[in-house]
Amino acid sequence: MTEYLLLFIGTVLVNNFVLVKFLGLCPFMGVSKKLETAIGMGLATTFVITLASICAWLVNHLILLPLDLVYLRTMAYILVIAVVVQFTEMVVRKTSPDLYRLLGIFLPLITTNCAVLGVPLLSVNLNHTFMQAAIYGFSASIGFSLVMVLFAGVRERLVLADVPAPFKGSSIALVTAGLMALAFMGFAGLVKF
């Protein structure tokens, strides 16, 4: 149980996919202008990454490894992710039409989010068990959502701030993202080697 808790905390805070591994920067910058959109995208991404990690582990251990088709891993994972995203899109469209309209083009773009593909690939490289892969996928997506919601909250406040003209827009957003990355580096002290 302690191993799973350490995996969760380490993935969410210490090895955050956005601020440490620099995966998923496109939705991080694109959807984080409004808090509501960031929360919706975070929930959708959490669902997709968690389910894709579980499905990718199953595909890897039940199909690719027994049939010696490991060289098809990336293509198989992309196919799994596309199916999971389409399923998520159908669920969001039926359950929350407002959120579906709010997310717009970003929902289908989850398919091309490098964090969604990176999590299962890294999980396989780390030789995770099924439970570890599920926790790793869930915690990576929680870390992604946490950073995106925090960043959206800061960006909403920056709109009201008196920012110098050269720093308005993307410039101050990138500076803020850098400061957040520095803050998350402080969590590295939680892990002892």
Swiss-Prot record:
The enzyme's main class, written as a single word, is translocase
Q: How does it assemble?
A: The complex is composed of six subunits: RnfA, RnfB, RnfC, RnfD, RnfE and RnfG.
One GO cellular component term, please give it.
Answer: plasma membrane
Q: Which gene encodes it?
A: rnfA
Q: Does the keyword Translocase apply?
A: yes
Q: Which GO terms describe its biological process?
A: electron transport chain
Q: Report the function annotation for this chain.
A: Part of a membrane-bound complex that couples electron transfer with translocation of ions across the membrane.
Q: How does it sit in the membrane?
A: Multi-pass membrane protein
Chain ranges passing through the membrane:
5-25, 47-67, 72-92, 102-122, 134-154, 171-191
| The keyword Transmembrane is assigned to this record | yes
Q: Which UniProt keywords apply?
A: Cell inner membrane, Cell membrane, Electron transport, Membrane, Translocase, Transmembrane, Transmembrane helix, Transport
Record-listed E.C. numbers = 7.-.-.-
Q: Which Pfam families match?
A: Rnf-Nqr (PF02508)
**Similarity comment text for this entry:** Belongs to the NqrDE/RnfAE family.
Question: Cellular location of this protein?
Answer: Cell inner membrane
* InterPro entries (alphabetical): Ion_transpt_RnfA/RsxA (IPR011293), NqrDE/RnfAE (IPR003667), NqrDE/RnfAE_oxidrdctase (IPR050133)
What is the protein's name according to its record? Answer: Ion-translocating oxidoreductase complex subunit A
